């Protein structure tokens, strides 16, 4: 019985820490997005190419609706979008990707 109780306590601690980390990553992603991306992508829009927004339907249509796709785009850039791979740490880029995907899924 003690072993079962210990197992549930460990699971509870682990899942709460994962949720806190994810929330912190979204906060960090929001800060990085505001500082580096919002000039062109305020509120999920696109000031340069208006049809390629960060809204859920546009991300899906352009096959950019995954963390990997967004991370790749941010790191390497494409067309008018500059590459941020040399300017931002990988962790920061991943936080931005998580933030963008989360915001798009929740309607900005």
UniProtKB/Swiss-Prot annotation:
Main location: plastid
Top-level taxon of the source organism: Eukaryota
Gene Ontology CC annotations of this record: chloroplast thylakoid lumen
Residues annotated as signal peptide: 1-23
List of residues binding heme c: 37, 40-41, 81
Keyword RNA-binding: no
Function: Functions as an electron carrier between membrane-bound cytochrome b6-f and photosystem I in oxygenic photosynthesis.
HAMAP family: Cytc_PetJ
Family the entry assigns: Belongs to the cytochrome c family. PetJ subfamily.
Protein name per Swiss-Prot or TrEMBL: Cytochrome c6
Species this chain originates from: Gracilaria tenuistipitata var. liui
């Amino acid at each position: 019985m003690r072993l079962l109780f210990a197992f549930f306590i460990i699971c509870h601690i682990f899942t709460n820490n994962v949720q806190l980390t994810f929330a912190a990553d979204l906060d960090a992603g929001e800060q990085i997005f505001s500082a580096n991306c919002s000039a062109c992508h305020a509120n999920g829009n696109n000031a340069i190419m208006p049809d390629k927004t960060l809204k859920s339907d546009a991300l899906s249509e352009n096959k950019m609706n995954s963390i990997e796709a967004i991370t790749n785009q941010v790191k390497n850039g494409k067309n008018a979008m500059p590459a941020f791979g040399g300017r931002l740490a990988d962790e920061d880029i991943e936080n931005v990707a998580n933030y963008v995907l989360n915001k798009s899924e929740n309607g900005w």
